[in-house]
């Protein structure tokens, strides 16, 4: 993390000016936070020794359909869980949350037996307590595609987008709170156990969609992961959940493909394009090019 004076930081990121009314005196320590793919955040330490993270609203947020106000609503609603950072201040320029001390995990740092109970706690939280409009898979992927400005019209990317531009025809389950990015890089192990950060994509949706993303990120086989998850939640109809996860899998892969194409457009980093190609190839390699049930 790079260090800056408060004035230097505000020159680099004018959104920080929104905090002048929050801090009685300027933060004494200001650092950029590394690790996040979506946006550049700031770690701020007040003169009282309290640490915060400033999560700005930017063109990147708009490109990925991220709302800091929605993120604030989620964090405020789940405060009783003591699972995420405490939201402190929200402004049209960004969101200030408490800094979560501890070690950001890597894949070897957490196993599925510890990860899935965290997912279950999130999913089981009363959806009625979270004041959000339900997540729309179609709206999200259409937004990503429109942000790409016809750049991939006539390519395999468009063919896959069109092929998987529908919600799966499976038996519905009630919408629940989903994190949508529950990878090890968003888990911090500290004195109070493991906490979850970066709730910017969170929403109310089919929890099997979130479970699909979780198993995909953790590289866990579907049957194994679904069985363990259902055991944790006391769900008897495992087949219903396996069917849902399998149906969501190619759709989450296509959504990730579009996300990486958009990231490549925004940052011009070949690594993002490589990741998009990997998802494209994966969709065809698994015969999803020929099966859209």
Give residue spans per PLM region.
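An alpha-helical support segment within catalytic cores of ATP-dependent transferases
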Residues: 8-26, 127-180, 190, 237, ...
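Glycine-rich, phosphate-binding/catalytic loops in enzymes
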Residues: 71, 195, 212-214, 274
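Start-of-helix signal in alpha-solenoid helical-repeat scaffolds, especially tetratricopeptide repeats
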Residues: 243, 247-250
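ATP/Mg2+ or Mg2+-diphosphate-binding catalytic cores
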Residues: 3-4, 155, 258-293
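A general structural signal marking secondary-structure boundaries and capping sites
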Residues: 82, 122-129, 168, 233, ...
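ATP-binding pocket architecture of kinase catalytic cores
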Residues: 32-135, 155
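Active-site activation/catalytic loop segments of kinase-like enzymes and analogous catalytic loops
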Residues: 208-237, 250-267, 280-282
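Active-site acidic catalytic loop and adjacent metal/ATP-binding pocket
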Residues: 34-46, 50-54, 165-209
């Amino acid at each position: 993390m790079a260090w800056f004076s408060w004035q230097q930081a505000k020159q680099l990121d004018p959104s920080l000016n929104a905090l002048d009314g929050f801090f009685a005196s300027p933060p004494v320590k200001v650092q950029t936070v590394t690790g996040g793919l979506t946006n550049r955040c700031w770690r701020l330490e007040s003169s009282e020794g309290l640490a915060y993270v400033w999560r700005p609203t930017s063109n990147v947020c708009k490109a990925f359909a991220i709302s800091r106000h929605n993120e604030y609503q989620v964090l405020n609603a789940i405060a009783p869980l003591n699972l995420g950072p405490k939201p402190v201040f929200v402004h049209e320029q960004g969101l200030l949350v408490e800094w979560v001390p501890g070690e950001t995990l890597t894949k070897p740092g957490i196993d599925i037996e510890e990860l899935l109970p965290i997912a279950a706690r999130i999913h089981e939280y009363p959806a009625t307590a979270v004041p959000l409009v339900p997540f729309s898979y179609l709206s999200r992927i259409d937004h990503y595609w429109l942000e790409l400005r016809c750049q991939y019209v006539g390519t395999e990317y468009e063919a896959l987008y069109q092929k998987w531009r529908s919600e799966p025809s499976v038996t519905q389950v009630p919408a629940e709170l989903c994190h949508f990015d529950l990878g090890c890089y968003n888990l911090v192990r500290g004195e109070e156990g493991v906490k979850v950060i970066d709730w910017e994509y969170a929403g109310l949706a089919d929890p099997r969609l979130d479970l699909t993303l979780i198993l995909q990120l953790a590289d866990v086989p579907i049957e194994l992961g679904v069985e363990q998850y259902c055991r944790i939640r006391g769900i008897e109809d495992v087949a219903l959940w396996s069917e849902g996860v399998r149906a969501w899998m190619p759709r989450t892969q296509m959504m990730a493909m579009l996300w990486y194409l958009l990231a490549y457009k925004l940052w011009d980093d070949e690594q993002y394009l490589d990741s998009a190609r990997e998802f494209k190839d994966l969709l065809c390699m698994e015969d999803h090019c020929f099966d859209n049930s």
